[in-house]
């Protein structure tokens, strides 16, 4: 199992898009992504400049998306 990498919000959003998610809308500094096959799933990614997404938030986003750390590394 791979440790969670340090990743910026922009890179995380691109990785989630490669996994099939799309940006539904942006509210302030938060991007809301949805998946066409799973309409009940809504993922919010904080995008505050070039800062990396904190590990706890990244772990929660991966859990919501149904991805593992290894899958995220492949999508980056």
Q: What are these language model-derived features?
A:
Residues 1-27, 32, 36-37:
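N-terminal first-folded block
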Residues 24-25, 45, 52:
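Compositionally biased, low-complexity repeat tracts
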Residues 4, 49-50:
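Residues that cap or flank secondary-structure elements
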């Amino acid at each position: 199992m791979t440790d969670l990498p340090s990743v910026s919000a922009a890179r995380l959003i691109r990785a989630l898009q490669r996994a099939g998610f799309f940006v539904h809308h942006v509210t302030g500094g938060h991007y809301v992504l949805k998946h066409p096959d799973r309409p009940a799933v809504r993922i919010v990614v904080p995008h505050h400049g070039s800062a990396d997404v904190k590990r706890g938030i990244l772990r929660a986003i991966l859990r919501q998306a149904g991805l593992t750390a290894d899958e995220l590394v492949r999508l980056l």
